[in-house]
Amino acid sequence: MSAKKLFIQTLGCAMNVRDSEHMIAELTQKENYALTEDIKEADLILINTCSVREKPVHKLFSEVGGFEKVKKEGAKIGVCGCTASHLGNEIFKRAPYVDFVLGARNISKITQAIKTPKFMGVDIDYDESEFAFADFRNSIYKSYINISIGCDKHCTYCIVPHTRGDEISIPFNIIYKEAQKAVEKGAKEIFLLGQNVNNYGKRFRNEHKKMDFSDLLEELSTIEDLERIRFTSPHPLHMDDKFLEVFANNPKVCKSMHMPLQSGSSEILKAMKRGYTKEWYLNRALKLRELCPNVSISTDIIVAFPGESEKDFEETMDVLEKVRFEQIFSFKYSKRPLTKAATMPNQIDEETASRRLSTLQNRHSEILDEIVKKQENKTFKVLFEELRAGNSIAGRTDNNFLVQVEGSEELLGQFKEVKITNAKRMVLYGEIV
C-alpha cells in the first residue's frame, strides 16, 4: 500500500522543531505516512504553532485558511503546539474545517488524533517526560534532544506555563540513550532543549538519579565520537559558579551562551518576576566573559513592558554597552492572555515602544559591526551543515558564528578549519585552510 502524504509547517522555537520531529516520526513509522513539501498532494496537513507573541497567533488563522483553500478533497488539517494549548475549542469555532487540535504537551497523542473526529488534546498536565517517541531528525549531523518539558517560572509576561505546563525533567538514561543513538547515526552535535535547561534535575516523574545540569553536560560529553554540545535556554537565575566553570572548561560544550536579559532595570525585572537583578545578571555575564574569553553571548530583550520609564530603558541600554552581546532577539512587549502583565497599569504606547526598539536595535547593530570586524583573519573550526546557492556551503563555529565558504556536498557533516576573509553582520565569509 502506498504511503499517505504528510505536510507539516513549524512556527516558533527549537522546541517546536523537535516536537514536529516527534510527530513526523510517529506518523511515518507507525501510520504509513511520507513527508511531502507539496501541500496540494497531502493527506494530512499539520501546523505546529507558537503563542509567545500575538503575531504568530494571528498567523495561525491566516495559514489554516490558506490550507483549506488548497487542500485536496478528504485531506485533514491539524493544529498543534502552544496556540492549540491555549485556544483549544476556540480554534474549532474560528476555523470549523480544522479536524483536530493537539497541544504542546500532548504530541504523543498524534496517532490517536488523526483517527478521532474533532479530537482535542490540550491537557497541560499530561506527562510525556518518559514517552518513547519513534525517531526522526531533520539533520543527520545535529540532533535536538529535549531534557525537560514545561516551565515553573511564571514570568508575568509569558504564556508558556499556560501552554506547556509545569516543568518536569526527562530522566538521564533516556537523554543519554537518545544522544548515543543520534551519534551512532552520524550526529556530530547534540542540542539540548528546555525552557530552563540549567534548572534540570529539580523534579522528575519518578525516582531517578540525582543530577543537575552541569552533571548532565559532563556525563553526555563522555559519549565517544560526540564532538559538540549546545543547549537553550538557560535561566540567569541558575547560572551558579559550577555551571559557568563546566561551560568554560568542558571542550565539548560549545562556547555560545544564550542569557535572556528581558530588561536591564531591576524594578522591571521584579515586575516581570524574573528572580534576579541587573547586578546579578551583569555579574554572571562578565564572569562568563572572564572565564571564557571567546564566548558569544546572545540574549532576549523586551522593550516597553508596562511601567517601563525612560530611566528603566536606559538601564537596558547600559547592560547592552557593558555585555556587548553578539546577538539580540528584541521585541516590543506583546500583551498575552492569561498573564499578569496583560492587566498591569501603565501600558506603554506604540510610538514610545517603537522608538525604544529602534534605539536598541540600531545601537546593537553598531556593536555587532565592531564585533564581526574583529573576526577577520581569524581561523575557526566549522561544522558544515547546509548547502547554499552559488556552489557555497555554510556551517557554524564553536561560538555560533555562521560561516560560508565555496564548497560542495562532500563537505556536509565535516569539520574544517576556515580563515575569515570578509566579515558581515549575518555571515562570515572565508576560505578552507
Curated annotation (Swiss-Prot):
<feature type="binding site">
    <location>
        <position position="155"/>
    </location>
    <ligand>
        <name>[4Fe-4S] cluster 2</name>
    </ligand>
</feature>
<dbReference type="Pfam" id="PF04055">
    <property type="entry name" value="Radical_SAM"/>
</dbReference>
<dbReference type="InterPro" id="IPR020612">
    <property type="entry name" value="Methylthiotransferase_CS"/>
</dbReference>
<comment type="function">
    <text>Catalyzes the methylthiolation of N6-(dimethylallyl)adenosine (i(6)A), leading to the formation of 2-methylthio-N6-(dimethylallyl)adenosine (ms(2)i(6)A) at position 37 in tRNAs that read codons beginning with uridine.</text>
</comment>
<comment type="subunit">
    <text>Monomer.</text>
</comment>
<keyword id="KW-0949">S-adenosyl-L-methionine</keyword>
<dbReference type="InterPro" id="IPR002792">
    <property type="entry name" value="TRAM_dom"/>
</dbReference>
<dbReference type="GO" id="GO:0046872">
    <property type="term" value="F:metal ion binding"/>
</dbReference>
<keyword id="KW-0479">Metal-binding</keyword>
<dbReference type="Pfam" id="PF00919">
    <property type="entry name" value="UPF0004"/>
</dbReference>
<dbReference type="InterPro" id="IPR005839">
    <property type="entry name" value="Methylthiotransferase"/>
</dbReference>
<dbReference type="InterPro" id="IPR006463">
    <property type="entry name" value="MiaB_methiolase"/>
</dbReference>
<dbReference type="GO" id="GO:0005829">
    <property type="term" value="C:cytosol"/>
</dbReference>
<feature type="binding site">
    <location>
        <position position="158"/>
    </location>
    <ligand>
        <name>[4Fe-4S] cluster 2</name>
    </ligand>
</feature>
<feature type="binding site">
    <location>
        <position position="82"/>
    </location>
    <ligand>
        <name>[4Fe-4S] cluster 1</name>
    </ligand>
</feature>
<keyword id="KW-0808">Transferase</keyword>
<feature type="binding site">
    <location>
        <position position="13"/>
    </location>
    <ligand>
        <name>[4Fe-4S] cluster 1</name>
    </ligand>
</feature>
<feature type="domain" description="TRAM">
    <location>
        <begin position="373"/>
        <end position="433"/>
    </location>
</feature>
<keyword id="KW-0004">4Fe-4S</keyword>
<keyword id="KW-0963">Cytoplasm</keyword>
<feature type="domain" description="MTTase N-terminal">
    <location>
        <begin position="4"/>
        <end position="119"/>
    </location>
</feature>
<dbReference type="InterPro" id="IPR023404">
    <property type="entry name" value="rSAM_horseshoe"/>
</dbReference>
<feature type="binding site">
    <location>
        <position position="151"/>
    </location>
    <ligand>
        <name>[4Fe-4S] cluster 2</name>
    </ligand>
</feature>
<dbReference type="Pfam" id="PF01938">
    <property type="entry name" value="TRAM"/>
</dbReference>
<dbReference type="InterPro" id="IPR007197">
    <property type="entry name" value="rSAM"/>
</dbReference>
<dbReference type="InterPro" id="IPR038135">
    <property type="entry name" value="Methylthiotransferase_N_sf"/>
</dbReference>
<dbReference type="InterPro" id="IPR006638">
    <property type="entry name" value="Elp3/MiaA/NifB-like_rSAM"/>
</dbReference>
<keyword id="KW-0408">Iron</keyword>
<dbReference type="GO" id="GO:0035597">
    <property type="term" value="F:N6-isopentenyladenosine methylthiotransferase activity"/>
</dbReference>
<feature type="binding site">
    <location>
        <position position="50"/>
    </location>
    <ligand>
        <name>[4Fe-4S] cluster 1</name>
    </ligand>
</feature>
<feature type="domain" description="Radical SAM core">
    <location>
        <begin position="137"/>
        <end position="370"/>
    </location>
</feature>
<comment type="similarity">
    <text>Belongs to the methylthiotransferase family. MiaB subfamily.</text>
</comment>
<dbReference type="InterPro" id="IPR013848">
    <property type="entry name" value="Methylthiotransferase_N"/>
</dbReference>
<dbReference type="GO" id="GO:0051539">
    <property type="term" value="F:4 iron, 4 sulfur cluster binding"/>
</dbReference>
<protein>
    <recommendedName>
        <fullName>tRNA-2-methylthio-N(6)-dimethylallyladenosine synthase</fullName>
        <ecNumber>2.8.4.3</ecNumber>
    </recommendedName>
</protein>
<keyword id="KW-0819">tRNA processing</keyword>
<keyword id="KW-0411">Iron-sulfur</keyword>
